[in-house]
Curated annotation (Swiss-Prot):
Name under which the protein is recorded: Formate--tetrahydrofolate ligase
Stated family: Belongs to the formate--tetrahydrofolate ligase family.
Originating organism: Paracoccus denitrificans (strain Pd 1222)
Pfam family, one: FTHFS
Binding of ATP, residues: T65, P66, A67, G68, E69, G70, K71, T72
UniProt EC number: 6.3.4.3
Entry keyword annotation includes Cell membrane: no
Length: 555
């Protein structure tokens, strides 16, 4: 079998103007970046207002395991399959971060014969959106220290500046640093640090903004720290939001590319799926809905994190109405949830699969809590046995959910046509989408609701200072905001080793953060790393350029 990058290089790509034409876009509606990438212009997006909307399909998954689930691959394969059965469908996914690409994750454009191209560009600099986010974020950081240096009229307390710097690379030594050493000319020394760009609130804002005006307003609401008398200081107080918006003006325009089967794909934005909402941009999703019958999108990690945030944060804030959910599962991952070691996953083990299906069952139940019809996509691996596939299908049938075997990795859209027909049937049957909690529910109660109803926790543990902080934000007018849970993606609990469907555990809320610009409150449960480090043998060791200038080892 050819590698992903070999398949991507052999793709018969169409000029991006033809892909835009399939969406009904004229030459003036997009800005080409070479022959195979483009940005859809602000003016073209504004002209789409009032158009009938297509149906929004969410692709999510069971809790991720090292065995792999193939969520992005399924998203792309489903988009191609919908087009094959006569529906105008567009795929919407996030952009890739350089850090994980050179660390240990690999690319983020699908796999096998269900990929988005140009794969190499997408996994490297693409159209420069992440550079723009990095620049806007660090401009604000520079303006904070510059303000303190030149007299500090706002009386910002250097000890309580919470705005860190960012870069799009994994570099553990930058997590905690001291800046402004070397004398008075270099500023006021203080502790600081770096996060990876996808952890920036600016990235979350870019992905939740509805237009340029909304982008600028959100940037102005960013809270960067406190004064000496504990009053919040915003980016607007520093006068930074205008210049930040200028840096992000082009980045706000969605990126148009294509699948291997020459169907349109909008790849835009990339917020962290733990301390942010982990979804592609509202601008891209709305644009696709106005230009397509069906829009297939995904949310980061498993349904307990990604789908919950997609539904409670993105859909709530953007007024989106999803029509159905596709829950991706693999025989291998379910056996792992049933207690099988990774090294033993190749052997048939129906009993372990049935035990691991408890994880799948809870995700099905949770998606139904939001009023969404669900179909399970069994992402096929060559080692899956007929008995294992039958047991998985039986489990789903007993719970009133259809399970569809998919072979899009090997066959492209053709291998997901049955899934596409099932999705169309579900979407045409209608959904009764409702967020899990109302806006007016107190912040602490929102956190408890997610922990009890989605995770299955028996208790939520708040440290005293966290309760005080939540009450303070509630009184300051932030109580209507949704909450963004930051915890391990590997388990329903805060313990990454607790696989399957644990119950009755305690979720410890260790820290809360106000993302006033993005428009949510982050609840951190356990240790969350916002600046990753490279592994002992990073992917970068295998990446290079051959004699013909072709990238080698990227994926």
């Amino acid at each position: 079998m050819k590698s992903d990058i070999q398949i991507a290089r052999e793709a018969q790509k169409l000029p991006i103007a033809q892909i835009a034409g399939r969406l009904g876009l004229a030459e003036a509606d997009f800005l080409p970046y070479g022959h195979d990438k483009a940005k859809i212009a602000h003016e073209a997006i504004a002209a789409l207002a009032g158009r009938p909307q297509g149906r929004l399909i969410l692709v999510t998954a069971i809790n991720p395991t090292p065995a792999g689930e193939g969520k992005t691959t399924t998203t792309v394969g489903l988009g191609d399959a919908l087009n094959r059965i006569g529906k105008r469908a567009t795929v919407c996914i996030r952009e890739a971060s350089l850090g994980p690409n050179f660390g240990m994750k690999g690319g983020a454009a699908g796999g096998g014969h269900a990929q988005i191209v140009p794969m190499e560009d997408m996994n490297l600099h693409f159209t420069g959106d992440f550079h723009a986010v990095t620049s806007a974020h660090n401009l604000l950081a520079a303006m904070i220290d510059n303000h303190i240096h030149w007299g500090n009229a706002l009386r910002i307390d250097p000890r309580r500046v919470t705005w860190r710097r960012v870069m799009d690379m994994n570099d553990r030594v930058l997590r905690q640093v001291v800046v402004a050493l070397g004398g008075p000319a270099n500023g006021v020394p203080r502790e600081c640090g770096f996060d990876i760009t996808v952890a920036s609130e600016v990235m979350a804002i870019l992905c939740l903004a509805s237009d340029l005006a909304d982008l600028q307003a959100r940037l102005g609401r960013i809270v960067i720290g406190q004064t000496f008398d504990r009053r919040p200081v915003t980016a607007h107080d520093l006068g930074a939001e205008g210049a930040m918006t200028v840096l992000l003006r082009d980045a706000l325009q969605p990126n148009l590319v294509q699948t291997l089967e020459n169907n349109p794909a909008l790849v835009h934005g990339g917020p962290f799926a733990n301390i942010a909402h982990g979804c592609n941009s509202v601008m891209a999703t709305r644009t696709a809905l106005a230009l397509s019958d069906y829009v297939v999108t995904e949310a980061g990690f498993g349904a307990d994190l990604g789908a919950e945030k997609f539904l409670n944060i993105k859909c709530r804030l953007a007024g989106l109405q999803p029509a159905a959910a596709v829950l991706v599962a693999t025989v291998r991952a379910l056996k792992m949830n049933g207690g099988v070691a990774r090294t033993d996953l190749g052997a048939e083990n129906v009993a372990a699969l049935r035990a691991g299906c408890a994880n799948l069952g809870r995700h099905i139940q949770n998606l139904r809590r939001f009023g969404l019809p669900v179909v399970v996509a069994i992402n096929h691996f060559s080692g899956d046995t007929e008995a294992e596939i039958a047991a998985l299908a039986d489990y789903c049938r007993e719970r009133g959910v259809q399970a569809v075997l998919c072979r899009h990795w090997a066959e492209g859209g053709k291998g997901a046509e049955d899934l596409a027909r099932a999705v169309v049937a579900l979407a045409e049957g209608g959904a009764d989408f409702t967020p899990l909690y109302p806006d007016e529910m107190p912040l602490a109660e929102k956190i408890e609701t997610i922990c009890h109803r989605i995770y299955g926790a028996g208790q939520v543990e708040f440290l005293p200072h966290i309760v005080e902080r939540l009450e303070e934000w509630q009184a300051a007018g932030h109580g209507h905001l949704p909450v963004c849970m930051a915890k391990t993606q590997y388990s329903f609990s805060a313990n990454p080793a607790a696989l399957g469907a644990p119950e009755g555990f305690t979720i410890p809320v260790r820290e809360v953060r106000l993302a006033a610009g993005a428009g949510f409150v982050v609840a951190i449960c356990g240790d969350i790393m916002t600046m990753p480090g490279l592994p002992r043998e990073p992917s970068a060791l295998r990446i290079g350029v051959d004699a013909d200038g072709h990238v080698q080892g990227l994926f």
